[in-house]
Amino acid sequence: MRKASTRPLRILAPTRYPWRFNSPRHSRHAITNQPFLPMNKIDERIEGFTIFPPTLRRYDLVHAFNRIPVGRTPYLIGFESHLPRAFSLESTAYFRALTKSLAGKRCRGIVAISRYSERIFRKTHADSAVAGEIYEKLEMRYPNIEIPAVEDQAPDLNGPLQLVFVGHHFARKGGCVAVRLAELAQEAGVDMRITIVSGLAMGGDIWTDPARDEYYETWADRLERGNITHHRSLPNDQVQTLFRGAHFCLLPTFGDTFGYSAIEATANHCPMIATRQGALPEFIEDDSNGILLDLPVDGDGDWIHSSSPDRDTPGFERMFTDEIERLAETALTRVVGYLNNPARYRALRIEARRTVETMFAASDANEFWDRRYEEAVG
């Protein structure tokens, strides 16, 4: 372990929101956030590394996320699933060069954001010639959030059931499930209102989705139901207000590495309805602090149909529709079960908030990251 530095350090970091969840919210060091060059916009095959714009200022350390920074400055790097990000290129010289950087002296730490991502990393590099070097640098640290000092508003179970779905990638994150749930509730006479915040990105190259545009032609019309309110986007403070007044937050996702909206919702006492995939089962416990819906996953915890070569076929579309139906039916059954047991529902909200306070508090993360910066540079 390196000796810790005692002076304030100059840290260079990216600007995007995943880094915000995986960094100190407040630091005794001087952190400069700058946009990096998005190499994936040039070619998706080279998204595994990044370059920060040239600057005359010298930095002690780069705190990167997902993409390995080019240059001479030492770096720490966090990651959400695969590192290096070089999908299907694991046998290439390019992948070996990126891995060599992780094993080299510039890399001062590799931080997985979940057991899910740590597991994938170890599997990816199990046969690497430098496995020992990179495993020695590997550790796990969950994302963090500044937990709002708000009392539980505990919406009345006798009024309309209020659910919230937030996700730009509409189909991937489970927006179709939310729409179908609203339809099933109305058909069953259950008074349910679902607020959807989504830019409605779906299909195309999104790796979980049916690829053909024709598949989605009816979904926009189905958002016009009387028990659905749709916003293309909202400021974050308004989303937080929605969480506080909701009975559940929906994330019946087909592909999420972590699900940051899940910790934002539960920080506001709102339990989750989510799928058992990615890192979600690490902090959502079924019938304890939320509802977990089963999804067929592989050994890594990813949906077995992710990145299917058949996404543009009618067969894939039928399978996707069947999964939407199954998840929506199960969600409705589970939610209605809590209507008849208010004490059990209140316990769910209490445990949801307690989980966030225990696992994701920013105060603990601030100290962790500041100490890691000092150890990396010292």
What are these regions (language model features)?
Residues 111, 149, 153-186, 194-195, ...:
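Conserved donor-binding/catalytic core segment of Leloir-type glycosyltransferases
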Residues 53, 91-112, 219-221:
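Membrane-proximal helix-turn-helix segments that form the acceptor-binding/catalytic region
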Residues 254:
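Aromatic "clamp/platform" in nucleotide-sugar-dependent glycosyltransferases that forms part
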Residues 198-200, 207-234:
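Nucleotide-activated donor-binding/catalytic signature segment of Leloir-type glycosyltransferases, i.e.
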Residues 104-137, 147:
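A short, active-site helix/loop in glycosyltransferases that binds the activated sugar's phosphate group
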Residues 271-274, 284, 291-292:
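Short hydrophobic beta-strand element within catalytic cores of glycosyltransferases
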Residues 233, 241-246:
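Short alpha-helical donor nucleotide-sugar binding micro-motif in glycosyltransferases
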Residues 44-45, 317-374:
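A charged, aromatic-enriched C-terminal amphipathic alpha-helix characteristic of glycosyltransferases
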